[in-house]
From Swiss-Prot:
Source organism of the structure: Nostoc sp. (strain PCC 7120 / SAG 25.82 / UTEX 2576)
Protein name per Swiss-Prot or TrEMBL: Ferredoxin-3
GO molecular function list: 4 iron, 4 sulfur cluster binding; metal ion binding
Zinc found in the keyword field: no
PROSITE patterns: 4FE4S_FER_1, 4FE4S_FER_2
């Protein structure tokens, strides 16, 4: 199977790996990843005590917030989010044809 690769400015080959998922059990919702990402890829979502996503931000059942890959189509594959994550929550994979 073919994998998307590119060349760096220096002529080295580079295989971008795109954000696929974030482990909600590991994520602490610190927001470092969304600050370092220059593209609208991530979003902070609320979880209730059962670990289910809550749509209503005013809901009293909100336990905590975690980051999610809301728009994977906007990811450029730089992995800056994974490098800055203190809890190693990210799963990245190369783009395959």
């Amino acid at each position: 199977m073919a994998v998307l690769t590119g060349l760096t400015f220096g002529g080295n080959t580079w295989t971008p790996k795109f954000a696929e998922s974030i482990d909600k059990d590991k994520c602490i919702g610190c927001g470092r990843c969304i600050k370092v990402c220059g593209y609208p890829v991530l979003d902070l979502k609320a979880l209730n005590e059962e670990g289910e996503f809550v749509e209503d931000e005013e809901d009293d059942e909100i336990e905590r917030k975690v980051m999610v890959v809301a728009h994977p189509e906007n990811c450029i594959g730089c992995q800056a989010c994974a490098r800055i994550c203190p809890k190693n929550c990210y799963t990245h994979n190369p783009l395959e044809n």
